[in-house]
């Protein structure tokens, strides 16, 4: 990943997390920015571009979706679905965690066939989160 691409991915990551998680203080995301920036280049990341600019991305660690983010100006245009559909073409199973209060994301993944497998409290934020899973034959 080029440095400019990483800058764009990180801008989307920060903006999207702050926007989607109003129930978590912005400082949590800002304090984790450098750590995420360090691990993204070693992760499996697929991007969606519009006119040569990255507008969304999905990051994987094996079959685990570490994140699916779309720039705010490009949300509700099917970009997240396209990124997820692409990953589904070569991953037979997928899983991810989503905060219970992130209703929009929860509904999106439910529409895409994910089911709740477990729930736990995120020890870093104190927020309830769900483990969602998807099997290729579901």
Please describe what each predicted stretch is:
Residues 1-11:
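A short beta-loop-alpha structural element at the N-terminal edge
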Residues 64-75, 98-99:
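A short, internal acetyl-CoA/4′-phosphopantetheine-binding micro-motif in the GNAT/acyltransferase core
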Residues 84, 89-101:
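Conserved GNAT acetyl-CoA-binding A-motif
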Residues 11-27:
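Helix-loop element at the rim of GNAT/NAT acetyltransferase active sites that forms part
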Residues 70, 76-89, 107-111:
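Conserved acetyl-CoA-binding loop-helix of GNAT-fold acetyltransferases
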Residues 44-56:
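Conserved beta-hairpin
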Residues 23-45:
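Active-site rim helix/loop that mediates acceptor-substrate recognition in acyltransferases
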Residues 96-107, 122-128:
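Conserved beta-strand-loop-alpha-helix junction that forms the acyl-donor binding cleft
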């Amino acid at each position: 990943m080029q440095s400019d691409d990483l800058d764009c991915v990180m801008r989307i990551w920060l903006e999207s997390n702050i926007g989607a998680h109003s129930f978590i203080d912005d400082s949590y995301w800002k304090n984790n920015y450098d750590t995420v920036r360090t691990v993204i280049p070693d992760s499996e990341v697929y991007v969606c571009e519009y006119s040569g600019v990255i507008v969304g991305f999905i990051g994987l660690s094996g079959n685990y979706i570490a994140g699916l983010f779309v720039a705010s100006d490009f949300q509700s245009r099917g970009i997240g679905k396209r990124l997820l559909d692409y990953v589904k073409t070569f991953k037979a199973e997928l899983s991810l965690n989503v905060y219970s209060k992130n209703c929009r994301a929860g509904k999106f993944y439910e529409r895409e066939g994910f089911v709740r497998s477990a729930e736990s409290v995120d020890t870093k934020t104190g927020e309830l989160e769900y483990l969602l899973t998807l099997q290729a034959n579901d």
